Amino acid sequence: MLGDGNEGMATIPGFNQIQFEGFCRFIDQGLAEELYKFPKIEDTDQEIEFQLFVETYQLVEPLIKERDAVYELLTYSSELYVSAGLIWKTGRDMQEQTIFIGNIPLMNSLGTFIVNGVYRILINQILQSPGIYYRSELDHNGISVYTGTIISDWGGRSELEIDRKARIWARVSRKQKISILVLSSAMGSNLREILENVCYPEIFLSFLNDKERKKIGSKENAILEFYQQFACVGGDPVFSESLCKELQKKFFQQRCELGRIGRRNMNRRLNLDIPQNNPFLLPRDILAAADHLIGLKFGMGTLDDMNHLKNKRIRSVADLLQDQFGLALVRLENAVRGTICGAIRHKLIPTPQNLVTSTPLTTTYESFFGLHPLSQVLDGTNPLTQIVHGRKLSYLGPGGLTGRTANFRIRDIHPSHYGRICPIDTSEGINVGLIGSLSIHARIGHWGFLESPFYEISERRVLFLLPGRDEYYKVAAGNSLALNQDIQEKQVVPARYRQEFLTIAWEQVHLRSIFPFQYFSIGASLIPFIEHNDANRALMSSNMQRQAVPLSRSEKCIVGTGLEQQAALDSGALSIAEREGKVLYTDTDKILLSGNGGTLSIPLVMYQRSNKNTCMHQKPRVQRGKCIKKGQILADAAATVGGELSLGKNVLVAYMPWEGYNFEDAVLISERLVYEDIYTSFHIRKYEIQTHVTSQGPERVTNEIPHLEAHLLRNLDKSGIVMLGSWVETGDILVGKLTPQMVKESSYAPEDRLLRAILGIQVSTSKETCLKLPIGGRGRVIDVRWIQKKGGSSYNPEMIRVYISQKREIKVGDKVAGRHGNKGIISKILTRQDMPYLQDGRPVDMVFNPLGVPSRMNVGQIFECSLGLAGSLLDRHYRIAPFDERYEQEASRKLVFSELYQASKQTANPWVFEAEYPGKSRIFDGRTGNPFEQPVLIGKPYILKLIHQVDDKIHGRSSGHYALVTQQPLRGRAKQGGQRVGEMEVWALEGFGVAHILQEMLTYKSDHIRARQEVLGTTIVGGTIPNPEDAPESFRLLVRELRSLALELKHFLISEKNFRIHRKEA
């Protein structure tokens, strides 16, 4: 990472490097480790022995390409072959064969996997590292209780605690605890060995009474006592081999296997020298832990911070895949054992080929990628989303936390996160703080710990330090880029030391950071002037950049941070030259390259759909006849320009109120953004249908569909599938399909049968089950795929997929956002002549609410806005590093004002920079031509169009389904649901006195079954709709629920006459 010639200079690592390193570690080490664990398998008579020869395993290159795997819904994987031998002990013969044991999914160049045609990615998980941790809690009397928690490699926990009388207990369950002497004796130590291996033997002897001596008199007695407490069994259990096996399986295996990481942590914490190859908890560990617990009781030793990253480990791609491979080998072992016994029973001669099946490995990985919480579908909204998804860190998942149980302390930022986990980038909502993102330079070490690089000043080299190690050094904060080394060495600088901030002389500094963005994730590093923003708004910006839609014509940002090119390059979306050569031919779908005596055809991505329905497309940026070098960019992708990430557009913005249309973060825009396709994007929707073989026969795809109007079938070809290039509207048939059915003549009404007999209509033997275009799906058909699988059975159906492209201009209801957490909904589209205009006559494109800045404390947008205006006038682009105040005070403001002043001079426009109100200008009302009373901030920020679009959200219900229990309309757009009129909505309607509307909402349009039917009848016949007289279904449901609680509701009328009668009787 550090070159010899330029000391102190560091390069940014590949953003997908963590995924690649994890998968390579699994292939190089993890496979062999698990294969070596595979045992020798013998039959019951011990005549035949089966074993694997691990030294000769091999992975075969995949037979299909990545694109073909996606197209044909297959898994991009490699076949694993291992040599296996079958030994007959009687004749000492051995048969050896190379066997196929299954497919292992391969990682592609994007750091993702292709499983059943879907791009999936594995998320890194943060777990508590195995080892021992000491903490202190106050009991109900306010006295400190010290406990030591031993965490195993499996995630099981055992606790040691010391009471007021300095007695040490091992807690085996929430309610049961036993003496540590019993636990040590059950693990194989006698009293003499215990007293010899502890530092405080007199304390152990102090609570040793006769009853305790009897319990630890022998190992068998200790095991019986331990089993009685652990299993909570009464009576007197008898010592047996099965009892020991049960204890071994349920307790020792789950709670006492530390693993190599746990053994390392235990040795370090307790100053032990137990060999690393001994992964199990030993009596010596228990006694050393008890000694440390006694020391804490008497004020010696330190407690552990459970949230420190030195006490966490990363479960990476390698660990997840290795665990699943081990699980598959266990299943394979059971299958081989059963097959051998079956072959011997039926007197067959087995071979290694016959004994091994590929099903366990293949099905294990398929279920893992399909069901595991840490295996997620790749989010492909834009190139930034793809690269950020693989760098996520999650506390959730198997063995981790849940959103309900995680407390605030776990979610909070910790000093050890510095340079390892981004303090900004996390999810919003219930998982805040539980899903984080890796810092740019962080890497996962060999032991699963997060490491961060620092520059060692004395040795002039870059060090990668583990969590906790940097606390022993004085680390200068933010001194990576110095304008003048001599000036820097004389100054007093802020530094970190033992999780505290100090101000020390430069000579006392040991380490310094190597990069200004070292502490942030990729998303946060793309925010210019981030130091001027509130952290909550920066968090929103990091998330919203991942929701930006690729536009039809992308544009570079005028004000950036310098990481845009690296982010685009590592996303894998660009087409990169793999060798030198000359461009022979360029087209929209390929580039021909000559070099090294051959011609290379490089295919380009054309109108490919992402899983968020955005359009992924590559555009050539090299010309015919040009010579290119290896690593040069051949084609731009969606949302990139010139190899730089380009998610939005630089538009002219004014911060001012306008007739209330930008109230509460609403945004007013010009019609220019619509007519000139500034924010136009393409979206590709996928519609699919399957053809099955039913009990009545196979389903047919045809264009001859009875009882359907001809114009609905106008786009179908001879085979019944929509033609490429067709324009389709809502309700059109995309795929014509008929499903066979058996209909008896007796099932029809008599008048139907009479009409059929008179008109000669035959009984239909099939029903129409066509694929129809749903509401909001209008567009152009760009691709049709008929995936025909072998067999064609009902379990292996054929599938037809139709891809339709939509062109969406920006409209009222769409969501736009800047890069500083400033988001809003389009409220009105004004004509150009009505928009406020500048002193040079240019109308602004957007009007933002100025009240959205001071309360949100995201002042960075003001700097970006003004600097963007100066850059557009000077035709310059700026790349701003964060925390530029380390050079001088008010550096950001000085830069912006100097560029505005220069733009004002060069363009001869004095309104660009006015000394009375720098950054602001007087603008005019487009409707009247009069200037506004106050000067207004104008500029050119970078504004994104987000995936939250009104076309995907707007919905109306005319008819639809009702819930079975409440008989009220379903909820949700996908179910054609209705809009709920709740309690507060009813109050609002009551306030306006709209009795009839209120009655309709609560009866006819909701859950009054009889009233609904009467409305339908009277609408068809014509007449007055009767008022409902009985109770709606929801009230009936309430009555039934009360009855289930043994409460009966009755009603009766009380008149004055009845009241007097009841009063006399009383």
UniProtKB/Swiss-Prot annotation:
Domain of life: Eukaryota
SUPFAM superfamilies, sorted: beta and beta-prime subunits of DNA dependent RNA-polymerase
Keyword Plastid recorded: yes
InterPro entries documented for this protein: DNA-dir_RNA_pol_bsu_ext_1_sf, DNA-dir_RNA_pol_su2, DNA-dir_RNAP_su2_dom, DNA-dir_RNAP_su2_hyb_sf, RNA_pol_bsu_bac, RNA_pol_bsu_CS, RNA_pol_bsu_protrusion, RNA_pol_Rpb2_2
GO terms assigned for molecular function: DNA binding; DNA-directed RNA polymerase activity; ribonucleoside binding
Keyword line: Chloroplast, DNA-directed RNA polymerase, Nucleotidyltransferase, Plastid, Transcription, Transferase
Stored Pfam families: RNA_pol_Rpb2_1 (PF04563), RNA_pol_Rpb2_2 (PF04561), RNA_pol_Rpb2_3 (PF04565), RNA_pol_Rpb2_6 (PF00562), RNA_pol_Rpb2_7 (PF04560)
Cellular component GO terms, alphabetical: chloroplast; DNA-directed RNA polymerase complex; mitochondrion
Positions in coiled-coil regions: none
Listed EC numbers: 2.7.7.6
Record keyword Chloroplast present: yes
GO process terms (BP): DNA-templated transcription
UniProt catalytic activity: RNA(n) + a ribonucleoside 5'-triphosphate = RNA(n+1) + diphosphate
Localization: Plastid, Chloroplast
Assembly information from the UniProt record: In plastids the minimal PEP RNA polymerase catalytic core is composed of four subunits: alpha, beta, beta', and beta''. When a (nuclear-encoded) sigma factor is associated with the core the holoenzyme is formed, which can initiate transcription.
Role: DNA-dependent RNA polymerase catalyzes the transcription of DNA into RNA using the four ribonucleoside triphosphates as substrates.
Similarity comment text for this entry: Belongs to the RNA polymerase beta chain family.
Protein name: DNA-directed RNA polymerase subunit beta
